[in-house]
């Protein structure tokens, strides 16, 4: 059955949506130790498959993208490429969610991370005016209590 109505995605994790080829390239540029010697084996570490056995197995796939997305350029590029991908799939609206506190390992502030996502989203929407994107900032219940209250 074919449905002729606009497509949208209301729950899309930025750090779980990094293109494998971009992750591979950016990890190499940043001298991040890779868990594989080639892109095909690398994909096994970041792509969730149908035989995923637990939420912990699922969440492990987020670690490599998070290691990479610790600077504004990587965050912005990831957001821009995601917008372009969604537009190419025919979506007209999506809400991208992420936790700014998870992008502060190498000195970025939460504000820096938010600005990088907004920059990438705006660049993506400029290239692909058929799609509109909302950004949702999440607070996490892991780490010190002050991490979500920190003023940037």
Which stretches of residues belong to each language-model region?
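Metal-cofactor-binding active-site regions of metalloenzymes
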Residues: 1-152
């Amino acid at each position: 059955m074919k449905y002729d109505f606009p497509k949208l995605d209301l729950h899309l994790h930025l750090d779980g949506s990094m293109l494998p080829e971009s992750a591979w390239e950016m990890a190499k540029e940043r001298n991040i130790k890779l868990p594989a010697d080639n892109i095909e084996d690398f994909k096994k570490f970041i792509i969730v498959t149908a035989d995923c056995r637990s939420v912990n197995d699922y969440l492990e796939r987020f670690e490599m993208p998070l290691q990479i997305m610790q600077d504004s350029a990587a965050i912005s590029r990831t957001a821009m490429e995601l917008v372009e991908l969604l537009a190419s799939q025919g979506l007209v609206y999506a809400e991208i969610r992420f936790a700014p506190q998870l992008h502060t390992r190498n000195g970025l502030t939460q504000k820096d991370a938010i600005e990088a996502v907004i920059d990438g989203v705006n660049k993506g929407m400029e290239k692909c005016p058929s799609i509109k994107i909302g950004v949702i900032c999440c607070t996490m219940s892991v780490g010190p209590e002050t991490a979500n209250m920190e003023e940037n």
